[in-house]
């Protein structure tokens, strides 16, 4: 499926690094390195604007290597880029690591996955919701061990 893009100066198209990759890497479109202190977050430009086909979204996800080795992740993971958004794709990175992390120009900072979207119709139900074995137990209360 084709996703048409516009690139700002220095921007690069998302790129799949292997034939079986689900996510295409996004690069930091910055001129100077950015120091991300432990606990700090930053909005990183990619220099990419996308025309996402209707009925799809781009999900912005962390790169596993950055998360494992440095504690760097996408704060609102997965971030959603809606099909009607035409602004620059930017990535909210946060440093959960113990040391300062340097984001270098052109560094691969996140990945995007093209995903289908199904919109629900939300309706107020006049009678009680159907009962389940789980009931209202949430946040670690599935009953599974």
From Swiss-Prot:
The keyword Metal-binding applies. Substrate binds at residues 63-65, 76, 80-82. GO terms for biological process: dUMP biosynthetic process; dUTP catabolic process. Its EC number is 3.6.1.23. It catalyses: dUTP + H2O = dUMP + diphosphate + H(+). GO terms for molecular function: dUTP diphosphatase activity; magnesium ion binding. Pfam families: dUTPase. InterPro entries: dUTPase, dUTPase-like, dUTPase-like_sf, dUTPase_trimeric. Transmembrane segments: none annotated. SUPFAM superfamilies: dUTPase-like. Pathway: Pyrimidine metabolism; dUMP biosynthesis; dUMP from dCTP (dUTP route): step 2/2. It comes from the Bacteria. Keywords: Hydrolase, Magnesium, Metal-binding, Nucleotide metabolism. Its cofactor is Mg(2+). This enzyme is involved in nucleotide metabolism: it produces dUMP, the immediate precursor of thymidine nucleotides and it decreases the intracellular concentration of dUTP so that uracil cannot be incorporated into DNA. NCBIfam families: dut, PRK00601.1. HAMAP family: dUTPase_bact (MF_00116). Belongs to the dUTPase family. This is Deoxyuridine 5'-triphosphate nucleotidohydrolase. It comes from Chlamydia pneumoniae (Chlamydophila pneumoniae).
